[in-house]
Amino acid sequence: MIPEGYRNILGSMENTEKAIKAVKDMFQDNLSAQLALLRVTAPMVVMSGMGLNDDLNGVESPVAFPVKGMDGSQAEIVHSLAKWKRVKLAQMKVPEGRGIYTDMNALRPEEELDNMHSIYVDQWDWEKVITPGQRSLEFLKKTVRRIYEAIKVTENKLYVEFPQIEPMLPEDIFFIHAEELLQMYPGLNPKEREDAVVKEHKAVFIIGIGAVLSDGQPHDGRSADYDDWSTANEDGYHGLNGDLLLWNPVLECSFEISSMGI
């Protein structure tokens, strides 16, 4: 899976590990500042049948096992914390405009493996409380821009510590609906469409993923439990969700760094 001709521009695995830690430390501070988030501790295991695990696309099975100390009750390794976070917000009585984030560890044994997907998931998971009036495409885009700003600030700070890693992100992120993307590249499959638009714009947010498009197919599968691809938005399309993708010059393809929505 290592691209032909790849070399470590940091010179050693030790420097790579230092850079990874720097990115994680910087980004969590930048993200929490942009979105007014408090870091919380999250579980890796939840009890089966409680409705707390993420069903992803509705067909993936979690790693499950009986718990001896709980009379053999079934427990599951989390897929993600999408549902758990909402329970936590309610338990903590988090006010409007504030939220939580966590460094999530999960297992997805049915994941299709490649350079960007593993059965082990280590990601930032976040959620915040908003008002009913903020359920809009405008607010979604505003939030995406804040996240993108946190990424850019992290990129620039990383460059100060590791000048071999030069900033490459554009000033602004490009927004497009999945239907618009289909009309733009009707002869390409969804992944090819992503690669084409992200290669051109470098940073893209695709709106409305999960909705059935004019070709009779969704751009990609999403969880019906929490992904809203059906609400009519201000642009005349449907969806208050989407994916944030960046261009990866090493792999020469787009890669999703955030799947999110209202």
State what each model feature region is.
Residues 107, 177-262:
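A translation/RNA-centric and nucleic-acid-associated enzymatic feature enriched
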Residues 55, 90-92, 115-118, 139-141, ...:
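Surface-exposed beta-strand edges and their flanking turn/coil or helix-capping segments
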Residues 71-88, 138-146, 187-211:
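Hydrophobic transmembrane alpha-helix bundles
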Residues 31-39, 145-156, 214:
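Hydrophobic/aromatic-lined pockets within catalytic cores
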Residues 98-100, 121-125, 201-203, 241-243:
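Extracellular structured ligand-interaction cores
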Residues 1-117, 125-129:
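Class II aminoacyl-tRNA synthetase-like tRNA-binding/catalytic domains
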